[in-house]
């Protein structure tokens, strides 16, 4: 029950940060659709390569919300490196909080 509360708290924080101007980075269009369905209203960017995505997000507050699988972790790691070259420190803690609660059942953003 506590994990479920933590999950919903993390989703509410995601929605609030997005509404406050944070940009959410995801892997694909299904992820965008899923986040819209749960009420994320702000800008959502689909990952399109490390350099181009980092350049596009330069100077913005960023939440990396890639899938909880090896591809998602590789994208997260590369984006962290690329964004840090611009002096940007994206939020990855929210992803950890969301998937920590549900990782046994859900590993993809589109399944949220």
Question: What label would you give each PLM region?
Answer:
Residues 29-38, 45-48, 52-112:
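TOPRIM fold recognition
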Residues 19-24, 42-43, 61-62:
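Short active-site oxyanion
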Residues 1-23, 29-36, 56-57:
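Phosphate-handling DNA/RNA-contact segment within nucleic-acid enzymes
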